[in-house]
């Protein structure tokens, strides 16, 4: 490894101005601190100039690694050879000894001691120079005797991307523009070039995270402060080392705790602190206090472990820059005579192959290593891709992270093709994944490395199938790396599309259209008809006017408008007349024509169209098997307009076949799309056949890299966890300050769950707890939490959670992170909490009353007359709801938001009549307008039915959803006075499946009976819809499971 990558890269700090603490005057490992152990003032000055002209003498410690006491200025401490401490410093002691009157014998002793200290100082300087030479810290020594700067010509433009050419410089920073406040220039006040400017452009290194002014970059290069090394120089004179040394960097702000003493780095006023508080390694992320008691000299020498993600990091010792061979005159004249006339094609081919490749990878095989290549598409997900790219550069070697907007993945995969146990992470959409899989096919790597997916943007059906979720929120990159490392390798079928001209049509009858598809291989789906027509219109409009499609919201609105327009025009209504489909020899054309499908999908994975499941889950009585992505079969599904609409609310299409080969003939130009890439294909014959199987990384539910779950003994049987909720306003303002965010949180209740409970199950319990709170809102009891630190009681929150709440991960050291709802089943409660869970409610109304900081609370109950027996733990009986939770009681004053009457009233105002008429006629716009003008949703019509009853009976899903979102929760299970039926009963009688699913998802009771004792499931059975009855029964059984898994105490 070269000199720049071997040791400690620390900022040379300026001389102390006035009294200061010892480590602030000169860092524990600043150049002055390394060589300033002088015994007199003159030797101290000489040592300071020799190593850093701008620094004064700093702290010193002996070779034994002992600690020095703090002094009042630079060079105020000096440690002796045996570790003894002289509080005044050697120079101060010698000066004081010359000034104080003493006896002759005492004076001789002092002179002898001074002579010994001089000798010791000389030996220390020699030893430090040797240590610097061994560790590669030549950048700390002056390049010129007087320390004068040397001009290197005109200033070059700061580099923002990695250099893969033969001119690449090891340890070169990657500068990105930044405007983050609170980060001071890394050079400090003494060396900063624009320290008096109020505002100056700054840049941040994406690799080591230091911030400097743009004008100070040249000064940073003069002091030779290098970034962490990413490769090593080749050549016989550079012996290979199999380990990496630390890359130490000064930090003015640092999260976490000191590796040595275990204490935090918090300061009283740390936002604009100019003091160096920590020294951290850019590789392993270990951090130490900037004190000689914590950071010691041997830390420079010791190898770096590369931290928690060492198994996926490509060490810089593996990446070698090969020097270009220089042709000498003697070598050119000494040409050996050829004794053979065999062709040298292989050698010439190798030379051509290696031409232009100054880098090679020489890995060291280890069964514990799973090196990771990260490919990021910055154009996916707005600006998410750019942020993800920078975060991976911080955690990994930048030369294993590639920006796909700069170049494709082929060169990187070719470079790393011989690395064993290689894994790939594709950060982007499904198109990015398909691009990488196609390159892997082209290179024919053996074995093929598995590919994981970090979903960016929208859609992401393949990522959903592999448990990576529908999109990236703000999950810590550290956890993503653990998930990729521990993920399960599964297979993904890939299918060929072979297109030929339709032989049944003469050339003169061929219509306009392209003669080939955009892709000849698909991983997700291949479709034709309505969905492809809508996608094609969007792509054609975006290509014609790209400036009108720069907003995700506008894109969605255009999709909706195009779909509605196509629905009215019925442009795909005759699709079944112009296609012929043969699956494994079975002709499906008659069935397609009978059912008049307007869309046909050949589906490889269970997900389609941003998460829907068109194949569904066929039962045992069907002739089809559940869908899999590795069984070598493709599913053929037909859609009418009705089934396409039902797809968004849990429905499925018409299952046609599961086959290994498809022959498709089209007799007119038809819109088609391959994995989201649309075109209008001329009449053709298309053959679909299995191509191969790709290795993919599936996100595992249990993460073996988490030490908490490694040991089965560490998982308790039961967890008692307090639930706190946080508003979006507090989260956005305080999510980097965990303590203040805890103070701003509001207690919600206490759950007692199983030790292996996941978040999906926990969500059900929290929602049920909210329902229990509302059902007893008329009680006269008030419950408080008592803070153990302040002893002040805190009333729990009475505000109902909105449907959009999500869990927060509170275990990270730096901040809270949101957890995607689609990935809740992959997280355990123990992974995101320590005795308490935090949830984020974006619609929560922030209270003006400031809360006290919550500790681990005790339950305190204010006794009320008539209820003391219920609240006595020894006498009270367990009151169970459907989910098995104890029903708490609260005082009316705590539930003032829900204290108004829930009794249905007849329409009074004109707006009330307008709302009732809008619901009966199905006019959503009129309903929204009347409600905004003051109309009530708690009105009744003829037959004493609520608005939700009418909406459920008519089957208008949009109106049902609007009432659920804006109306009180009591409407869900409210029964009419004549039949005792709830809204779910009405929808089940009318066999409105979509409405039933909306009501069930909103929390409607599945076991409430009508006046005849019938449940909604029994009503659906009587109405002749066994599928709907089976669905309601399965949802009822799913909720009953919670009885044995949950105990709630309030």
Curated annotation (Swiss-Prot):
Question: What is the tissue specificity?
Answer: Specifically expressed in brain (at protein level). Expressed in hippocampus, cerebellum, brain stem and spinal cord (at protein level). Highly expressed in hippocampus, cerebellar cortex, olfactory bulb, and olfactory tubercle and to lower extent in the cerebral cortex, caudate putamen, and thalamus. Not detected in the white matter. Also expressed in eye.
**What does the record give as EC number?**
2.7.1.107
Pfam families, per the entry: Ank_2, C1_1, DAGK_acc, DAGK_cat, DGKI
Q: Where is this region: Disordered?
A: 52-73, 325-356
User: What residue intervals hold the motif PDZ-binding?
Assistant: 1048-1050
Named from the GO MF annotations, one term is: ATP binding
What does the record list as GO biological process?
diacylglycerol metabolic process; excitatory postsynaptic potential; habituation; intracellular signal transduction; lipid phosphorylation; neurotransmitter secretion; phosphatidic acid biosynthetic process; phospholipase C-activating G protein-coupled receptor signaling pathway
UniProt domain DAGKc: residue ranges: 367-502
**Activity control mechanisms:** Activated by phosphatidylserine.
Keyword check for Cell membrane? yes
Q: Which UniProt keywords apply?
A: ANK repeat, ATP-binding, Cell membrane, Cell projection, Cytoplasm, Cytoplasmic vesicle, Kinase, Lipid metabolism, Membrane, Nucleotide-binding, Nucleus, Repeat, Synapse, Transferase
Pathway linked to the protein:
Lipid metabolism; glycerolipid metabolism
Where can this protein be found? Cell projection, Axon; Cell projection, Dendrite; Presynapse; Postsynapse
For this UniProt entry, what's an example GO CC term? excitatory synapse
Q: Which family does it belong to?
A: Belongs to the eukaryotic diacylglycerol kinase family.
Role according to the record: Diacylglycerol kinase that converts diacylglycerol/DAG into phosphatidic acid/phosphatidate/PA and regulates the respective levels of these two bioactive lipids. Thereby, acts as a central switch between the signaling pathways activated by these second messengers with different cellular targets and opposite effects in numerous biological processes. Has probably no preference for any of the diacylglycerols in terms of the acyl chain composition, especially for the acyl chain at the sn-2 position.
Q: What is this protein called?
A: Diacylglycerol kinase iota
Q: Which organism is it from?
A: Rattus norvegicus (Rat)
């Amino acid at each position: 490894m070269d000199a720049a990558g071997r040791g400690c890269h620390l900022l040379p700090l300026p001389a102390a101005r006035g009294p200061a603490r010892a480590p602030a005057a000169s860092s524990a490992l600043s150049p002055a601190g390394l060589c300033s152990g002088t015994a007199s003032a003159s030797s101290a000055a000489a040592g300071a100039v020799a190593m850093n002209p701008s620094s004064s003498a700093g702290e010193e410690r002996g070779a034994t690694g002992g600690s020095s006491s703090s002094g009042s200025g630079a060079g105020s401490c000096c440690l002796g050879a045996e570790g003894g401490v002289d509080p005044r410093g050697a120079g101060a002691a010698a000066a004081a000894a010359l000034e104080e009157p003493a006896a002759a014998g005492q004076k001789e002793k002092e002179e002898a001691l001074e002579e010994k200290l001089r000798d010791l100082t000389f030996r220390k300087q020699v030893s430090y120079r040797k240590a610097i030479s061994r560790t590669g810290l030549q950048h700390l020594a002056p390049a010129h005797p007087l320390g004068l700067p040397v001009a290197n010509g005109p200033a070059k433009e700061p580099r923002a991307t990695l250099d893969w050419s033969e001119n690449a410089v090891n340890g070169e920073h990657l500068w990105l523009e930044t405007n983050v406040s609170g980060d001071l220039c890394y050079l400090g006040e003494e060396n900063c070039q624009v320290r008096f400017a109020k505002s100056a452009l700054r840049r941040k290194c994406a690799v080591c995270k230091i911030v400097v002014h743009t004008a100070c970059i040249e000064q940073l290069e003069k002091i030779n402060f290098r970034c962490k090394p990413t490769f090593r120089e080749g050549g016989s004179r550079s012996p290979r080392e199999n380990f990496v040394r630390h890359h130490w960097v000064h930090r003015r702000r640092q999260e976490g705790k000191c590796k040595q003493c275990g204490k935090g780095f918090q300061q009283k006023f740390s936002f604009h602190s100019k003091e160096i508080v920590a020294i951290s390694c850019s590789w392993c992320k270990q951090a130490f206090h900037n004190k000689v008691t914590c950071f010691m000299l041997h830390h420079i020498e010791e190898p770096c472990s590369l931290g928690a993600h060492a198994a996926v990091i490509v060490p810089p010792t593996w990446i070698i820059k090969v020097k270009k061979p220089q042709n000498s005159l003697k070598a050119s004249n000494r040409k050996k005579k050829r004794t053979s006339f065999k062709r040298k094609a292989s050698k010439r081919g190798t030379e051509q192959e290696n031409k232009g490749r100054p880098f090679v990878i020489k890995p060291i095989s280890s069964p514990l290593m799973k090196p990771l290549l990260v490919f990021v598409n910055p154009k996916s997900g707005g600006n998410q891709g750019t942020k993800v790219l920078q975060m991976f550069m911080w955690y990994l070697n930048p030369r294993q992270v590639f920006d796909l907007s700069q170049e494709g993945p082929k060169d990187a995969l070719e470079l790393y093709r011989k690395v064993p146990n290689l894994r790939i992470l594709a950060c982007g959409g499904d198109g990015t994944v398909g691009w990488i899989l196609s390159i892997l096919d082209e290179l024919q790597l053996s074995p093929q490395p598995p590919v994981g997916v970090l979903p960016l943007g929208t859609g992401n059906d393949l990522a959903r199938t592999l448990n990576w979720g529908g999109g990236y929120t703000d999950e810590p990159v550290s956890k993503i790396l653990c998930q990729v490392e521990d993920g399960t390798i599964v297979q993904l079928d890939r299918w060929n599309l072979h297109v030929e001209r339709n032989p049944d049509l003469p050339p003169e009858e061929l219509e306009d259209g392209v003669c080939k598809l955009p892709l000849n291989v698909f991983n997700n789906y291949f479709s034709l008809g309505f969905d492809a027509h809508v996608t094609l219109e969007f792509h054609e409009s975006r290509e014609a006017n790209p400036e009108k499609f720069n907003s995700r919201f506008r894109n969605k609105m255009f999709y909706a408008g195009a779909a509605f327009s196509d629905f009215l025009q019925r442009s795909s209504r005759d699709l079944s007349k112009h296609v012929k489909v043969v699956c494994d020899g079975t002709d499906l054309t008659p069935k397609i024509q009978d059912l008049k499908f307007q869309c046909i999908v050949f589906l490889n994975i269970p997900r389609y169209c941003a998460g829907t499941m068109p194949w569904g889950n066929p039962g045992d009585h069907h002739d089809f098997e559940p869908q899999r992505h590795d069984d070598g079969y493709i599913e053929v599904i037909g859609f009418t307009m009705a089934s396409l609409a039902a797809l968004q609310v849990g429905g499925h299409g018409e299952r046609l076949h599961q086959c290994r080969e498809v022959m498709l003939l089209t007799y007119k130009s038809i819109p088609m799309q391959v994995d989201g890439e649309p075109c209008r294909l001329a009449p053709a014959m298309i053959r679909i056949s299995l191509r191969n199987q790709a290795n993919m990384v599936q996100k595992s539910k249990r993460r073996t890299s988490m030490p908490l779950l490694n040991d089965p003994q560490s998982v308790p049987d039961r967890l008692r966890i307090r639930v706190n909720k946080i508003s979006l306003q507090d989260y956005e303002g305080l999510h980097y300050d965990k303590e203040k965010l805890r103070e701003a949180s509001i207690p919600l209740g206490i759950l007692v769950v199983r030790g292996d409970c996941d978040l999906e199950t926990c969500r059900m319990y929290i929602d049920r707890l909210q329902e229990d709170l509302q059902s007893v809102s008329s009680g006269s009891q008030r419950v408080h939490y008592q803070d153990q630190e302040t002893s002040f009681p805190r009333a729990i929150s009475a505000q109902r959670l909105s449907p959009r709440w999500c869990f927060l991960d509170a275990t990270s050291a730096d901040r809270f992170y949101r957890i995607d709802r689609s990935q809740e089943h992959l997280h355990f409660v123990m992974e995101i909490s320590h005795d308490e869970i935090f949830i984020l409610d974006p619609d929560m109304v922030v209270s003006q009353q400031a809360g006290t900081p919550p500790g681990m609370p005790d339950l305190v109950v204010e006794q009320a007359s008539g209820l003391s027996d219920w609240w006595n733990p020894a006498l009270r009986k367990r009151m169970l709801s459907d989910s098995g939770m104890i029903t708490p009681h609260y005082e009316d004053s705590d539930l003032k938001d829900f204290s108004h009457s829930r009794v249905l009233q007849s329409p009074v105002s004109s707006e009330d009549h307008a709302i009732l008429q809008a619901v009966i006629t199905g006019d959503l716009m009129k309903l929204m307008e009347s409600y905004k003008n003051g109309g009530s949703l708690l009105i009744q019509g003829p037959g004493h039915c609520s608005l939700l009853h009418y909406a459920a009976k008519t089957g208008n899903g949009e109106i049902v959803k609007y009432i659920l979102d804006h109306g009180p929760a009591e409407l869900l299970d409210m029964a009419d006075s004549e039949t005792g039926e709830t809204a779910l009963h009405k929808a089940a009688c009318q066999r409105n499946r979509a409405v039933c699913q909306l009501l069930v998802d909103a929390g409607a009771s599945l076991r409430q009976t009508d006046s005849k004792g019938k449940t909604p499931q029994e009503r659906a059975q009587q109405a002749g819809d066994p599928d709907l009855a089976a669905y309601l029964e399965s949802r009822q059984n799913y909720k009953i499971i919670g009885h044995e898994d949950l105990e709630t105490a309030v």
